[in-house]
């Protein structure tokens, strides 16, 4: 049976410093993300009919997952899908402004890049407990949203363009309880070229 595996990061653990510190990145990737994968593989044991499905397919079609393992797949499959996506939209050469059609769409939808950042930051800062803030494409339109725990926008039929993990494990070593500071630091490492590519694929 095919196993889900931890993807390699496209940069070193210290590449996003000082914004995202080396120790947090290492623990986040090798411990937290890896645990979701271990638990997902355990949940899928004995379910050969799900073996060939990508994690994105699993979380996008939870109603097709047997009820006995649906919650485990939602939580751990969501954790795997969300983190796999997250690593790809971060870059040591990130920051700056959105590019291409995404830049135009953000301007049209939110009025300005600053207004978008404010709405995204609010989604992340006001998410009670653990969860994620997202910029998604929903029915062809950009939308800022948040999800609880490891729920994926894919489950709601939405396609992520950028996302930010606001679980404490993502920032506590460096930012303690200062979640807004962590959200502010995120803008220095967003890979807008990757986000533009995601937008092109989603719209």
UniProtKB/Swiss-Prot annotation:
Mn(2+) binds at residues 28, 83, 165, 169. Its EC number is 1.15.1.1. Its cofactor is Mn(2+). It catalyses: 2 superoxide + 2 H(+) = H2O2 + O2. GO terms for molecular function: metal ion binding; superoxide dismutase activity. InterPro entries: Mn/Fe_SOD, Mn/Fe_SOD_BS, Mn/Fe_SOD_C, Mn/Fe_SOD_N, Mn/Fe_SOD_N_sf, SOD_C_sf. Keywords: Manganese, Metal-binding, Oxidoreductase. Binds 1 Mn(2+) ion per subunit. One of its GO terms (cellular component) is cytoplasm. Belongs to the iron/manganese superoxide dismutase family. Destroys superoxide anion radicals which are normally produced within the cells and which are toxic to biological systems. Homodimer. This is Superoxide dismutase [Mn] 1. The lineage of its organism: Bacteria, Bacillati, Bacillota, Bacilli, Bacillales. The gene is sodA1.
């Amino acid at each position: 049976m095919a196993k889900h595996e931890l993807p390699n990061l496209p940069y070193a653990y210290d590449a996003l410093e000082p914004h995202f510190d080396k120790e947090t990145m290492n623990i986040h990737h090798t411990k937290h993300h890896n645990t979701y994968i271990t638990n997902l593989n355990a949940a899928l044991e004995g379910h050969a009919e799900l073996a060939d499905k990508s994690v994105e397919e699993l979380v996008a079609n939870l109603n097709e997952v047997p009820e006995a393992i649906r919650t485990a797949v939602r939580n751990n499959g969501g954790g795997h899908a969300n983190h796999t996506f997250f690593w790809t939209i971060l870059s040591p050469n990130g920051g700056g402004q959105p590019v291409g059609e995404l830049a135009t769409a953000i301007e049209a939808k939110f009025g300005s890049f600053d207004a978008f950042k404010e709405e995204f930051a609010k989604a992340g800062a006001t998410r009670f407990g653990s969860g994620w803030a997202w910029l998604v494409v929903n029915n062809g339109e950009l939308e800022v949203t948040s999800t609880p725990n490891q729920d994926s926008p894919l489950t709601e039929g939405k396609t992520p363009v950028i996302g930010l993990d606001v679980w404490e494990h993502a920032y506590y070593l460096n930012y303690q309880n200062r979640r807004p500071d962590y959200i502010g630091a995120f803008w220095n490492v967003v890979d807008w070229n990757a986000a533009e590519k995601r937008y092109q694929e989603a719209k």
